[in-house]
C-alpha cells in the first residue's frame, strides 16, 4: 500500500456485475470466478493465488474455446489468437522475477481486471450474442480435451 504523505491507497478491486454476463451460464460462472481470484490476490498469498488464477485461466480458455469450436463460431481463430496473446502478456508480466510488493500486486490486479473487462465486454459478448442467436438450448457443461489443456499449459509455462 502506497503511503505517500501518510495517505494509504485503497486496493484496486473490481467486483463482478451482472452487466459482464454474456448469457452462457458456464462461461459467466467461470468469468465470475476469475474476478473472485483477482480480488483475492494479496501480498501474503500472491504466489499461491497467481498460480491458482493461471491454472483456472487455462481451464476457462480451454472450455470457452471448446464451445466456440464445437458450435462453429466463425471468429474462433481470431479469439484463440487473443487468448494466446494474453498468455504471452501474462508470461512477460509475471516472469520478471520481481519480488511481490503491494505495488506489484495492485499492478497485476489492474492489468488482469482491465484485460478481463475489455475482453469479456467485446469479444466474449460478441460470441455470446452469436451463440444465443443460433442455439435453441443452453449448452451442456463442457470441458476441454487434455490436448487443448496441454497447449495452453505450455503457453503459460505451467507443468
Where in this protein do the model-derived segments appear?
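Small-residue-biased structural context
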Residues: 2-159
Amino acid at each position: 500500500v502506497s503511503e505517500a504523505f501518510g495517505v494509504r491507497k485503497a486496493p484496486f478491486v473490481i467486483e463482478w456485475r451482472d452487466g459482464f454476463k454474456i448469457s452462457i451460464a458456464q462461461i459467466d460462472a467461470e468469468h465470475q470466478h476469475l474476478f473472485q481470484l483477482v480480488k483475492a490476490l494479496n501480498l501474503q498469498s500472491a504466489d499461491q493465488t497467481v498460480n491458482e488464477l493461471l491454472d483456472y485461466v487455462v481451464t476457462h480458455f480451454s472450455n470457452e474455446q471448446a464451445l466456440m469450436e464445437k458450435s462453429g463460431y466463425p471468429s474462433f481463430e481470431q479469439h484463440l489468437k487473443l487468448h494466446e496473446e494474453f498468455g504471452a502478456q501474462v508470461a512477460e508480466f509475471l516472469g520478471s522475477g520481481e519480488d511481490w510488493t503491494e505495488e506489484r500486486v495492485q499492478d497485476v490486479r489492474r492489468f488482469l481486471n482491465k484485460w478481463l473487462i475489455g475482453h469479456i465486454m467485446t469479444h466474449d459478448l460478441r460470441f455470446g450474442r452469436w451463440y444465443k442467436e443460433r442455439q435453441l438450448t443452453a449448452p451442456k457443461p463442457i470441458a476441454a480435451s487434455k490436448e487443448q489443456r496441454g497447449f495452453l499449459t505450455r503457453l503459460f509455462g505451467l507443468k
